[in-house]
Design a protein with these regions (language model features):
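Long amphipathic alpha-helical segments
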Residues: 1-61
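N-terminal targeting/anchoring "stem" of glycan-biosynthesis enzymes
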Residues: 4-27, 31, 81, 208-212, ...
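A short, well-structured juxtamembrane/interface segment
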Residues: 64-82, 91-95
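Nucleotide donor/acceptor-binding cores
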Residues: 83-84, 105
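Histidine-anchored nucleotide/phosphate-binding helix
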Residues: 92-103, 168-171
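Active-site core of metal-dependent hydrolases
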Residues: 103-111
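Conserved phosphate- and dinucleotide-binding cores of soluble alpha/beta proteins
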Residues: 110-241
Length: 241
């Protein structure tokens, strides 16, 4: 999907800003937004902060600024080795941004529910060296890469929610001794009260394998990139917002 969680969240902030003078309307609007975005961590984060803030409008302005000024991609771009080959999966605007900033990094993009094709299209248009990898080629792609890049949709205390195939990608990298770097962008870190229900909704359905999401333990991650910097150890997941 090309419409990222970031774009949806920024649009929701604009909508919520129009009802900040009515706490009841703000609560109802936030609840309706979350019903339609059950795994959008930035949106859940923004809504939770807005409905509990003494000044919801100011809180929304702060959230919008932090999301727009997110420097995660810049930190990742600066850390990537020269002329490296990376393996990534699905769609991440921050990963794509980092690779476009570099230009010298080759990307092997494993598809996940068609999102890998969106990544390939954006990288190709920017002139990046990239190739789409079918799921059955995942292991060999990881072995051929210098770094495996994954992106957290939501970060919990012990694990992360990520696009389908991420657990397999990171597990292969871990087993073959390849570094796993993870992007945990602005507002993806959630408290247990928000993260656990999100994961339960994914795992509690009759066919969790068809949800499009994986739950990956922190232990598979060797380095983390957040808006505040990186590469940091996985311990950064415990404190990143």
């Amino acid at each position: 999907m090309c419409s990222s969680d970031l774009e949806v969240t920024l649009g929701a902030i604009d909508a919520l800003a129009g009802v900040t003078n009515d706490p009841g309307a703000l609560m109802v609007s936030a609840r309706r937004l979350l019903e339609h975005q059950p795994v959008n961590a930035p949106l859940w984060n923004v809504c939770a902060r807005a409905v509990t803030a003494l000044d919801p409008r100011a809180e929304l302005r702060t959230s919008a600024r932090l999301l727009r000024d997110d420097a995660t991609a810049a930190h990742l771009a600066a850390a990537l080795p020269d002329d490296a080959t990376v393996c990534t999966i699905g769609w991440s605007g921050h990963v794509v941004d980092a690779l476009q900033r570099r230009g010298d990094v080759r990307a092997l993009v494993v598809d996940s529910l068609g999102d890998g094709q969106d990544t390939l299209r954006h990288l190709s248009r920017a002139g990046n060296d990239c190739e789409l990898v079918a799921p059955e080629g995942l292991a060999t792609a990881v072995e051929s890469a210098d770094v495996t890049l994954v992106h957290a949709a939501a970060v919990g205390d012990d694990d992360v929610l990520a696009c389908g195939g991420t657990l397999a990608l990171a597990s292969v990298a871990w087993c073959t001794g390849r570094p796993v770097w993870m992007v945990a962008s602005e507002a993806t870190r959630l408290p247990a009260a928000l993260y656990d229900p999100m994961v339960d909704a994914v795992r509690g359905r009759p066919d969790p394998w068809a949800s499009g999401f994986d739950v990956m333990p922190h232990g598979l991650v060797g380095a983390v990139f957040t808006p505040r910097g990186g590469p940091d150890g996985a311990v950064a997941l415990a404190v990143s917002e």
